[in-house]
């Protein structure tokens, strides 16, 4: 991953984290970064992996969290601006430490130079009309609540809400962000994101949301974004239909303490 030191510190909420490290011959060979009960990051340099160093760090983190009254540890955490879980390649390590998976997600990317909306077989517009939301925010929040109540807090600015409507009724919706500052920015420069993509249950399975995301992806390309980033999804195969590809899979791990 290509990421600058300053961006790393910013994304990590550095000032609210606790840092653990392991040294050999006065050189750091492993470290972990923890915020409250969330292990934001744990790294062991390859030559030192498999020697119990990571296990010792986990033990130190458990004691630290327990001493502060926490009864569990989690990998990543959805509030993390870096990894929100344990990446799949490292999950076996966490299992050995007693972590249990309570879910999994994928993160996806599409290089926009390769994207061509007119080459896709889309059918949502057979029944839906697409455009930027220009109505009452309470109406969009009502539709969002039918999909995921926790998302309503993010729908606060109508200027970045894109919707599909059927006979004037909100059927699908998503948030649209350009020039995002995240862990992909240093590598890809201009990153855009469709987020909180959802379809009201009674309008599902009609291709409405798929065309909506495709249209938003085209918009991001028109705005000069280099890539479109899908953050935290459980429907990777659905996004693959319009060209997105998974580059990272993560497990949400939990370990009870005490």
Features from the language model and the residues they span:
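Short amphipathic alpha-helix that is part of the acyltransferase structural core
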Residues: 1-23, 27-28, 105-107, 118-151
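Acyl-donor-binding surface of acyltransferase catalytic domains
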Residues: 59-126, 253-255
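Conserved acetyl-CoA-binding loop-helix of GNAT-fold acetyltransferases
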Residues: 50-65, 196-199, 205-218, 222, ...
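Short hairpin/turn module used for nucleic-acid contact or packing/dimerization
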Residues: 224-258
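A conserved beta-strand-loop-helix scaffold within acyl/acetyltransferase catalytic domains
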Residues: 7-19, 24, 29-42, 145-199
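A structural microfeature
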Residues: 29-30, 103-106, 171-172, 248
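A short, internal acetyl-CoA/4′-phosphopantetheine-binding micro-motif in the GNAT/acyltransferase core
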Residues: 39-50, 78-79, 196-204, 234
């Amino acid at each position: 991953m290509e990421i600058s030191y300053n961006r790393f510190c910013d994304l990590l909420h550095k000032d609210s984290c606790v840092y653990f490290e392991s040294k050999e011959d006065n050189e750091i060979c492993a470290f972990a970064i923890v915020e409250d009960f969330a292990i934001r990051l744990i790294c062991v340099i390859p030559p030192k992996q498999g020697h119990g160093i990571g296990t010792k760090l986990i033990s130190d983190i458990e004691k630290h969290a327990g001493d502060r009254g926490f009864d569990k540890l989690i990998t990543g955490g959805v509030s993390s601006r870096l990894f929100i879980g344990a990446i799949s390649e490292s999950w076996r390590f966490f299992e050995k430490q007693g972590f249990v998976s309570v879910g999994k997600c994928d993160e996806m990317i599409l290089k926009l130079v390769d994207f061509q909306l007119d080459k896709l077989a889309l059918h949502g517009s057979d029944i839906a009309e697409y455009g930027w939301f220009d109505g009452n925010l309470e109406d969009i929040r009502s539709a969002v609540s039918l999909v995921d109540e926790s998302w309503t807090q993010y729908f606060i600015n109508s200027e970045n809400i894109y919707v599909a409507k059927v006979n004037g009724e909100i059927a699908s919706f998503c948030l649209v962000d350009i020039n995002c500052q995240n862990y992909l920015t240093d590598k890809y420069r201009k990153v855009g994101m469709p987020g909180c993509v959802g379809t009201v249950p009674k309008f599902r399975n009609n291709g409405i949301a798929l065309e909506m995301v495709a249209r938003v992806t085209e918009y991001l390309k028109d705005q000069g974004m280099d890539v479109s980033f899908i953050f935290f999804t459980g429907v990777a195969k659905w996004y693959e239909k319009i060209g997105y590809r998974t580059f990272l899979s993560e497990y949400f791990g939990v370990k009870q303490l005490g």
